[in-house]
């Protein structure tokens, strides 16, 4: 569902150098027409369909044209974003309207602690990665030989010398 700008609603973010939709578009598709001072999607086929431009537009000038299997040709999708949820309004070409409301977040903002319980970063001399913990050799296995079928010599942990000269 690529996005389209309604020129009658777009005010070019009050004549600024960069509109909100230009700022937020990850694919740099939204541009400002310097003559009319209206934003538009320069390549709708390349739209990633993230709908960031729709959600950020202060005038509600950007809409998504839904795929035919979702809403028949001529329909539009319009979001209304609140602080806790987003409501999508689907206008069908016959005039009927349906609304769907979804939460924006399922966890309180700031409640996720991704590095909790992880070691402190900054030890560049450590051979372990940031998230790795040191692995130790099991005490039971130290000094015991591990028999490997069809091997010429037996192998053991490297803490003690192995018989047969292999290390």
UniProtKB/Swiss-Prot annotation:
Positions annotated to bind [4Fe-4S] cluster 1: 10, 13, 21, 57
Name of the protein in question: Adenylylsulfate reductase subunit beta
GO cellular component, one term: cytoplasm
Binding site for [4Fe-4S] cluster 2: 25, 47, 50, 53
Site (Important for interaction with AprA at the substrate channel entrance): 152, 159, 163
Positions in coiled-coil regions: none
Entry GO MF terms: 4 iron, 4 sulfur cluster binding; metal ion binding; protein heterodimerization activity
Subunit structure: Heterodimer composed of AprA and AprB. The heterodimers can dimerize to form heterotetramers.
Superkingdom as given in the UniProt entry: Bacteria
């Amino acid at each position: 569902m690529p996005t389209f700008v309604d020129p009658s609603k777009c005010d070019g973010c009050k004549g600024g150098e960069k509109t909100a939709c230009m700022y937020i578009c990850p694919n740099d598709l939204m541009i400002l027409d310097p003559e009319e001072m209206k934003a538009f999607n320069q390549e709708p086929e390349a739209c990633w369909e993230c709908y960031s431009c729709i959600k950020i537009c202060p005038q509600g000038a950007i809409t998504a044209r839904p795929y035919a299997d979702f809403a028949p040709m001529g329909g539009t999708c319009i979001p209304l974003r609140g602080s806790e949820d987003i409501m999508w309004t689907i206008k069908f070409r016959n005039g009927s309207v349906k609304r769907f409301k979804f939460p924006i977040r399922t966890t309180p903002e700031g409640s996720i602690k991704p590095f909790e319980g992880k070691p402190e970063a900054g030890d560049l001399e450590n051979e372990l990665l940031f998230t790795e913990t040191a692995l130790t050799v099991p005490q039971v296995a130290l000094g015991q030989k591990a028999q490997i079928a069809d091997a010429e010599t037996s192998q053991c942990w490297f803490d003690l010398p192995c018989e047969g000269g292999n290390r």
